[in-house]
């Protein structure tokens, strides 16, 4: 045991020991109209049923995250995000690992959920889909979300994922498949980045400063220590996705791990919480370095400011702060983290296979001190 042992950061929402071979994934958090926080996570690993029927647990806090209570389990829900639309709670994602794309509604703030049995009750698209708890964006009278189509000529991770965006009119019934419009699918092209491109995934639907919807994606590359993101352009009607490989890749700290981007009207800035590679780990696969979590901001989506180091542990093998989902809450940001950390039984299985779900807040985030900046010569179009 050392000085870092057992000092689990944040408020523990759930804990599962590594011995179960079941790990905590896909944190999601949203704020209900009454001010309560609702959080969720799924389960993955050999001890779970992720490939046959995803399972998501839902929690509620009525004291601004100080304590949490489990309120429901959803069987047949995976890699999903919670969100509120017109004062009603929804959850959206695949039915299992690479399952159908579905959506559920709860009229009692997360205790009971609708069943997506057909195309009029939440079964949006049959097939194989991939995503994470990604943001919903309102723009031009529509609700937008990025996902990935996972049906391909191969089952290889990364190569099977095609970028796409799905959207629906704000006044439509979100449980009806017919309400949703999808773009074409843009498959992984391994010739990109001089043959070093491995995947794009976990895209964010984001509205650019000039009012265009883009899909801002995590990128996996064969180049050690390289953090990149990809910018896919989406047509105004939500039907066409297009990509220019000569301009569409940008250097983006944290781009090799999942991140979420949201726009704050008050500061007129885009914000994200992402992983940052620390000194001494630049020779590693960037996607495997998750021991440092930072807050960043940008006015243009290409040049980013480092505002605050949120979480850090010197070890990268069995410690990780990852897959953060977050929300603005007045002057603060609240966030939920998939945390691999010490426990009394030897700690997490590894940095990836998390044993904790933890809640955190960033007080007065708009006043966080600027630590550094990351300039990027390649603007998103």
Label each region the model flagged:
Residues 261:
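Catalytic cores of secreted/periplasmic lytic hydrolases that degrade extracellular macromolecules
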């Amino acid at each position: 045991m050392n000085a870092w042992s057992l000092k689990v950061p944040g408020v523990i929402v759930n804990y599962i020991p590594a011995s179960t071979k079941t790990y905590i994934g896909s944190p999601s958090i949203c704020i209900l109209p009454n001010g309560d926080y609702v959080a969720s996570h799924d389960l993955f690993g050999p001890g779970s049923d992720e490939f046959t029927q995803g399972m998501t647990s839902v929690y509620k806090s009525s004291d601004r995250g100080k304590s949490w209570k489990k309120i429901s389990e959803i069987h047949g829900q995976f890699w999903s995000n919670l969100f509120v639309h017109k004062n009603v709670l929804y959850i959206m994602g695949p039915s299992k690992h690479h399952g159908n794309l579905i959506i559920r509604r709860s009229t009692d703030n997360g205790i009971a959920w609708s069943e997506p049995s057909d195309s009029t009750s939440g079964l949006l698209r049959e097939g194989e889909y991939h995503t994470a708890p990604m943001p919903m964006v309102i723009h031009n009278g529509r609700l937008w979300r990025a996902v990935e189509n996972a049906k391909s000529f191969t089952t290889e991770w990364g190569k099977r994922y095609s970028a796409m965006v799905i959207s629906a009119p704000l006044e439509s019934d979100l449980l009806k498949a017919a309400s949703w419009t999808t773009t074409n699918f843009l498959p992984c092209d391994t010739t990109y980045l001089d043959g070093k491109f491995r995947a794009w995934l976990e895209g964010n639907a984001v509205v650019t400063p000039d009012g265009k919807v883009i899909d801002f994606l995590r990128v996996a590359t064969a180049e050690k220590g390289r953090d990149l993101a990809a910018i896919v352009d989406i047509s105004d009607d939500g039907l066409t996705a297009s990509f220019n490989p000569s301009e569409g890749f940008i250097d983006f700290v944290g781009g090799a791990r999942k991140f979420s981007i949201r726009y704050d009207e008050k500061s007129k800035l885009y914000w994200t919480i992402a992983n940052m590679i620390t000194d001494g780990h630049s020779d590693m696969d960037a996607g495997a370095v998750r021991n440092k979590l930072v807050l960043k901001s940008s006015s243009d989506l290409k040049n980013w400011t480092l505002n605050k180091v949120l979480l850090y542990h010197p070890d990268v093998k069995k410690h990780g702060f990852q897959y953060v989902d977050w929300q603005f809450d007045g002057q603060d940001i609240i966030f939920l983290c998939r945390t691999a950390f010490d426990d009394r039984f030897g700690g997490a299985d590894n940095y990836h296979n998390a044993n904790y779900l933890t809640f955190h807040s960033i007080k007065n985030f708009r006043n966080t001190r600027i630590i550094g900046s990351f300039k990027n010569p390649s603007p998103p179009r």
